[in-house]
Amino acid sequence: SSSLEGSNVGLGISFYLNEKNHFVVSNVYVNSTADKKGLKPNDEIVSLDDLECSKNDSDTIIKYIKAHEGKSVKIKYLREGKEYTTNLIPGVFDTTVICNIYDGYGEIILSSFSENSGKDFSKAMTRLQESGIKKLVLDLRNNGGGYLNAALEISSSLIPEKSVVFKEQDKSGKFTKQMTKDEFNQVKMDKIVVLQNENTASASEVLIGALKDNLGKKVTTVGTTSYGKGTEQVTVPFSDGTSFKYTVAQWYTPNGTSINKKGFKPDIEVELPEAKTTSYYKFNKKDVIKKDSVDTNAKPLQIYLMYLGYSVDRTDSYFSNTSSEGLANFQQENGLDATGDCNKKHGIYWLKKYY
């Protein structure tokens, strides 16, 4: 399926709108055209060819990029106030691996296990190695799994060669050891911190088990107990669009532990605040959340405001006068029109402040 493949068409970035209506890069996907050209988080995209970002909404920009798949697009962007120009060719990219390098450690965010995740992860690890990084934060939160083969490939970049990644038991009771892949080389880390939550499942848990059993105290898990999916399924599609899924095996960690219906308990338990697990509905152009009104986005808006420390007296779908004052204070402090109302532009910009 497309979700397992993890593919999309574009430049290979995710972005948000800032107060100047520039498209600010929030993430760059490994091995995408943007990644190959050196775009970085916080770069502000000013224009694409003759299309000025400040005069167009995100839907128009996205449509323009997709319409130019395989064609060169001139990108003008700002980095730390200095203007740069480069040519990018929109194309298919994998959306599962993001790599960031910070002072003293690297971060890899793995959103799922797709067909291409293994090679993209390997490239990210090589990048960390070339930068002299010896500590890794591996973010598996909300990663529900995917291809087990990708879990084998990714494990091969982290644990010694010829190691057991997991054991599977078929319905006859026969056990088979699944080993690391020879074509992927281990990049040794002194410390790996794995972030997990209740939505970390399946192939993600295979990876956690492989790391814990093979690397021992070098690995620390942080978050909440993982989902606990210790079985393997096969999906059979039918011509009418429906499909049939059935279980073919159960998997165990290298040391023989089953986490099915139990999950992995973290070494350090950390509960996320409500704001970190609250999503919002898409803002349309004309949507405005005004004080003393009811709106589906008023709930997440007030939850985010409260998380950021602004005055809020409720967290339901009613946007109160007090919450509007809190939003106005936020807007004033961030160079926005202090209206106390939330529209698409102000909403997206300030939501990025939270995320």
Model-predicted segments: where are they?
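C-terminal, low-ordered peptide segments at domain boundaries
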Residues: G12, Y29, K37, D49-I133, ...
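Acidic, Ser/Thr/Pro/Gly-enriched interdomain connector segments
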Residues: E269-Y318
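Short glycine/proline-centered loop/turn elements that form peptide/ligand docking sites
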Residues: S2-S3, K20, G38-I61, T224-T225, ...
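Gly/Ser/Thr-rich loop/hinge elements
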Residues: D94, G145-L195, N199, T231-T235
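Conserved PDZ fold ligand-binding element
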Residues: A34-N56, L136-D139, N214, V222, ...
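PDZ/PDZ-like domain micro-motif
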Residues: V30-E44, T96-V97, Y318-F319
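PDZ/PDZ-like peptide-tail recognition elements
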Residues: S1-N27, N87, Y281-K290, V294-L301
